[in-house]
């Protein structure tokens, strides 16, 4: 059984960022990924936007926190960010919990920019009661992936990434976790980072921890 300073489950943005963070501090890390390559799921699907909190009108504190991370992400990873387009938000005139006036007030309170536009410029009359030009960007997930893989390659003795991993169980005793995989592998560490995003509850359930109340929705995003 191999022992590590950190076991990271998931090779998306959070997983590889964490692995690089640990390697730079001299720690021995293994990343376990179920897919055949990194950045195959949420990190790739969510590249449609580097969001600034506009979709959190129910929580100003969350929006403000998102805005702070928006600035940090664009500073740290400017090499993969595309800013050359308009990002338009609209509030529906029907069946919406937020209207145009509320959205505008929310943006002002959260200190995030929005420019009010005429709804008829983008939508049929009566469909939307508010349309706004905002400041959000997209990023190229493949460029970002290549960056992390190149940086991690500088630490061949500190990091190991295993692909196609099927985690079957996780044992926990007083001071360590043991992750068991379908191929008979066993990996031990006092620290396990669950960076699986949509698979978070599957991992929590294996350890016997309380699961999050997550609602899953099937989404399709077109980035042009």
Residue ranges and their predicted role:
Residues 23-44:
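Glycine-rich FAD pyrophosphate-binding loop
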Residues 1-14, 30:
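Beta1/beta-strand and adjacent pyrophosphate-binding region of the FAD-binding site
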Residues 27-29, 114, 192:
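Hydrophobic anchor at the start of a short beta-strand
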């Amino acid at each position: 059984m191999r022992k590590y300073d950190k076991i990271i489950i998931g090779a998306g943005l959070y997983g590889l960022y964490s692995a690089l963070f640990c390697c730079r501090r001299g720690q021995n890390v293994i990343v376990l990924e179920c897919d055949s390559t990194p950045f195959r799921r949420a990190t790739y699907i969510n590249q449609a936007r580097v969001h600034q909190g506009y979709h959190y009108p129910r929580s100003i504190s969350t929006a403000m926190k998102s805005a702070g991370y928006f600035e940090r992400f664009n500073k740290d990873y400017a090499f993969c960010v595309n800013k050359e387009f308009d990002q338009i938000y609209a509030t529906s005139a029907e069946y919406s919990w937020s209207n145009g006036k509320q959205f505008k007030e929310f943006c002002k309170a959260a200190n995030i920019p929005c420019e009010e536009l005429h709804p008829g410029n983008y939508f049929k009359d009566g469909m939307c009661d508010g349309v706004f030009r905002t400041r959000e960007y997209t990023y190229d997930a493949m460029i970002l992936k290549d960056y992390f893989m190149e940086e991690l390659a500088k630490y061949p003795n500190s990091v190991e990434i295993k692909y196609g991993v099927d985690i079957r169980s996780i044992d926990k005793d007083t001071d360590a976790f043991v992750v068991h995989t379908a191929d008979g592998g066993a990996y031990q560490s006092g620290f396990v980072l669950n960076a699986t995003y949509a698979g978070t509850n599957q991992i929590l359930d294996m350890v016997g921890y309380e699961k999050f109340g997550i609602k899953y929705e099937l989404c399709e995003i077109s980035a042009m």
